[in-house]
């Protein structure tokens, strides 16, 4: 028997992992987006707004989606959960049935839809907004090897108009 690497090897080949994530788990974009909307509903949101931005690239004639945003009026997340929600296997309901049990839905569905995912959330007012991100390109080239703690930040101006601040 040939030993490939006597010192062991990483469980995940990180340089290929990003693309594998983007191309697994969902049969179509609608299913991936439904997963994210379901997260809003589980967070007791009464309203979920999905904003899809598209543009015609200089080399083509058909418009292409370049950004998708989900805004809701749910309970929000603490800074720890803003960071943790992007971690694979960070489920919160191991004993329950249905979605959210294993902690792969948000990161996997988001990365299926786009190569960079940014999460913004707040509790006790929008002035307490925190954000964290996953970036496939940075993961693949080794720049992002962990999810950094959520940073206190402002909601991007283009979305602030949709947020109830009072």
Predicted feature residues:
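Bergerat-fold GHKL ATPase/HATPase_c domain
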Residues: 1-49, 53-60, 80-83
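Generic recognition of well-structured, leucine-rich alpha-helical segments
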Residues: 24, 43, 89-92, 113-116
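Short beta-strand element(s) in the Bergerat
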Residues: 64-68
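Acidic ATP/Mg2+-coordinating residue in the GHKL
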Residues: 72
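Bergerat-fold ATP-binding/catalytic subdomain of histidine kinases
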Residues: 84-99
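GHKL-type ATPase core
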Residues: 95-166
């Amino acid at each position: 028997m040939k030993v490939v690497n006597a010192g062991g090897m990483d469980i995940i080949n990180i340089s290929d992992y990003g693309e594998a994530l983007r191309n697994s788990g969902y049969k179509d974009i609608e299913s991936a987006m439904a997963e994210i909307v379901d997260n809003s509903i589980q967070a007791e949101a009464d309203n979920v707004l999905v904003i899809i931005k598209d543009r015609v690239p200089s080399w083509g004639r058909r418009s292409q989606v370049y950004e998708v945003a989900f805004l809701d009026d749910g309970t929000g997340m603490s800074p720890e959960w803003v960071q943790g929600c992007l971690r694979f296997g960070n489920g919160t309901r191991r004993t329950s049935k249905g979605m959210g049990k294993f902690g792969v839905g948000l990161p996997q569905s988001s990365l299926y839809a786009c190569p960079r995912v940014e999460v913004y959330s707040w509790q006790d007012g929008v002035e307490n907004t925190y954000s964290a991100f996953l970036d496939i390109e940075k993961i693949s080239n080794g720049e992002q090897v962990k999810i950094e703690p959520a940073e206190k930040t402002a909601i991007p101006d283009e979305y602030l108009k949709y947020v109830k601040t009072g």
